[in-house]
Amino acid sequence: MITLEATKQVADDSPDHICPVGAVRDNFTSQGLIEEVKDGFDNEQIAMLDLGCAGGQFVVDFINKGDIGIGLEGSSNSLQGIGKDNWDKYHNKNLFLCDITKDYQIYQVGEPMEFDFIHSEEVFEHISPDDVDAMLKNIFKHLKEDGLCVFGVSLVPDVRNEKGEDMVPPFAPEDRTIGYEGKLFTLHQSVFPATWWKDKIESHGFKIFKEGLHNENHFGYLFNHIVRGAGYSGNVPGYAGWDESAYFCCTK
């Protein structure tokens, strides 16, 4: 039995909960990445954790392969979103509501869990700068020695109106906030260069792989697939928008 002890379950003060977009619209997965990760662990059963799991399909696809899959999501709107079937089946079993910027611990049969594989794409930038350190600290304590993390972080702004419509480039063709009298929601609260994220990740003890893809925005990326990226839903590095995200593969 898997349980979660969380200081706070719903990030009810987050713009992503108040103006839900990804929590209700996103249910991305990547069979290609799953196969690559499984191959890296010699196709043995692994424990995986997905942070900001939205509809939960990436987690469910690992479960369907016999793995221990856990997803954490900060908005309760996800329960009625595109991944409703997943949440109906796995809520409080494998999919949990959790504010990942507050202290939490996942347990299996009463013992603290550590994970072979931890994944988070298009999540870190949604976290307030003041909460990034706490988020990374929580991730690090849940990672096994010699475990693997895949982090994908958007580097571009994302502002929405009350209808969830894009208001600024690159997702909107022009800046629509000028003269707009309605309410605006800044979903990407932490828009920083890739090197800022690299330094922040390393400051919490994560070790970026020397192998893999290394360039201006990508650090040790070991795989030929991703789950998504920069809102374009690409499953293969190099798709349109690839350079609008930073990708990291790291271990303890």
Where do the protein language model's features map onto the residues?
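Conserved N-terminal segment of class I S-adenosyl-L-methionine
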Residues: 1-113, 117-121, 133-136, 212, ...
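S-adenosyl-L-methionine-dependent methyltransferase catalytic module, highlighting the catalytic core
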Residues: 27, 86, 101, 127-144, ...
